[in-house]
Amino acid sequence: MSHKPSAIDAIANEYTAKVIELSPMTGSSTGLGERHDVLDDFSPEGLNAYTQLDRETLAKLDEVAPTDAVDEVTVAAMRERLGLSIELAKAGEPLRNLNNIASTSQDIRDLFDLLPTESEQDWANICARLGDVKRALGGHVESLRLAASRGQVAAARQVRAVAGQAHNQAGESSSFLALVSSPETQSLPESLRKELAANAASAQAAYGDFANFLETELLPQAGEQDGVGRERYQLFSREFLGATIDLDETYEWGRERLAAIDAEQREVARELYGDGVSVQEALKRLDEEPRYQQHGTDALKKWMQETADAAVAGLNGTHFDIPAPLQRIECCIAPSSTGGIYYTGPSDDFSRPGRMWWSVPAGTTVFNTWQERTTVFHEGVPGHHLQLGMQTYLRDELNDWRRHLCWVSGHGEGWALYAERLMADLGWQDDLGDRMGMLDSQRLRAARVVLDIGVHTGKQRPAELAALPGVGEGKWDRDSAWAYLTHNVAMAEGFLSFELERYLGWPGQAPAYAVGQRLWESIRDDAAAKAAREGKEFSLKEFHSRALAIGSVGLDVLREALS
């Protein structure tokens, strides 16, 4: 592939620069920004600026013709993404956005995990940003108030969840407090240390005020219904997939997929422990096996790092070509304790490597590797680290927008789930315990498809759900979703509770994993079949290289680009 910078690239790069101007937080997370001492403007005026920029950029794209296939993908992807952003803004979604995992209060809190702490200037920037938390959350409150005045308020369950997180951030377990009292601050000038402490206290107080606003002002206006309805759900589904799917067909496919995975797990349970041992019993026994246990976060971190490094070494040059900057991944324990596991991409110059984070719930001290080995492949190589790292690495082929700003869950999470199954197919999960963990991960994602569409579109409970103890017939709701989840997924209750709240508050995102994997496997199989028809040898490594070189785009755009 050889692509010369074009007029289309110039528009995309200009758009990226303007987004980073509007969002210093995005500038810091990508490594492209110059302002590292302020947070974003989350007020209605601040949010509207993005919509104006989207409209202006789409108008510019209409005036320029693509010069090659790379340009064609850029134009198609930008029209799809920016057009959808405008639709979401028209519907008031950015103003009302509030959930337990991906809304403003978490974005502000988690940004501080990414900020450099090497120099005095780095700490001065952190200090300034801590002092800016009050203003940033104040803008968010303005937006939530405006949405509420229009009758648009998140479900009460999400308001309560975020209020709980905000109280936590205001209290003694605050990540702000941990940050400014870390050993690294001891070498700083006393005046800066004092200011850091004062601004951390201010940031904590801002979260306390935010929690109070949520509980006293927003919660009384919030409804108890978790489902968002078919119309809103279809819009969210497009946001996370970059494709329009048949929700009813996908729901039935999810049920079938879940049944197939269950059959696989039953067979593994039999191989592990003999006839008559159920999947649930096998999972319980695996948890009790010392060979699959890590004790304490230090041991967990070491195991994560060793597993991730082994995957890089074993896959490079065989099934993937991994550029040198991507051969480094850093495994970290997150300062927060939400129960999530996530990846943050490298900075533009790779001075900050890609990182895998484990946010360990308070009180959790034993970690089961049979269940989490597949997660390391999902977040690391060949999952998110390879995919997002390649996007950053391909500076000569992809413009700034495609390298840094375009992220579609169905593409990205679909790839990471595809990577999990691929690692099993390549022999990395032949240990029966590890294989059970991979299948359990696949089962979770298939269950999400059924649960998410079921709850949010108000479907009747399927027979397999209605038959569970204490459930019965009726429409999907939180309690039946919990029964479905606990029946289908082997995770600690703290993790599962967070997961369910996430599905209820972030409609359309959870199915993107399995639906995205479905498309990735379909595209790969189509490419292999085409090669066979033409009498050519199919190279999986070449397919992966070509697919990852496109970067993260909507699934409809990806299929078109690879066909």
Where are these regions (language model features)?
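N-terminal maturation segment of proteins
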Residues: 1-563
